[in-house]
Amino acid sequence: MIPWDYNHYPFDAWNKNHTLDSAMSASVNWYFQTIDKKLGHGKIRSYLQQIHYGNESIDQSDSYWMESSLKISAFEQVSLLTDFYQNTFAFNPEHIAAVKDSIRLITHGKNTLYGKTGTGNVNGQNVNGWFIGYIENSQNTYFFATNIQAEQQASGSIASEITLNLLETMGIWN
């Protein structure tokens, strides 16, 4: 748990203490920025290189993952998720399990959906929406990454809607 610093943030859900699960669920930027400050840019850059995260380019800001120099494609996201799922990075298995638990969204029948949305905002407009994750069932694991970009109204929630509709049409999610 990381205690809230009593700064007023733009979303009520951010204005409290958070665990990994609650911070993932509410996309609490200050939670992850606090962890990043403890790690430092050198360690973060090293981790990004270790997992081959997109172009591995981070600036010195504390929001390098939001509309900055760090870029990744949907194909790279799927590759990263697959490696994360199989823990080919050789991270502590307990840490991998904790992250998997924190992105578990719903179990429906024999399917469990894991995922994370993200929204990039520039000048007050949602211009970049992501939904990445995977679906587990008794036969297979299906990985996905959806990225939408527009001058406005491109959000993670819209990317999630599109993804789930496609997965339902394909018979993977119902």
Task: State where each predicted segment sits.
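Generic preference for hydrophobic/aromatic residues in regular secondary structure cores
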Residues: 2, 56-60, 105, 109-113
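Structured C-terminal helix/loop/strand segments within mature extracytoplasmic catalytic/sensor domains
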Residues: 37-40, 82-174
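Mid-domain, small-residue-enriched loop/turn segments at the edges of structured enzyme/sensor domains
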Residues: 6-20, 32-86
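Donor/substrate-binding cores of folate-linked one-carbon enzymes
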Residues: 27
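Short, well-structured active-site flanking segments
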Residues: 1-10, 92-96
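Active-site SXXK
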Residues: 1-2, 23, 144
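A generic structural signal for nonpolar/aromatic side chains embedded in well-ordered alpha-helices
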Residues: 23-24, 48, 99, 103
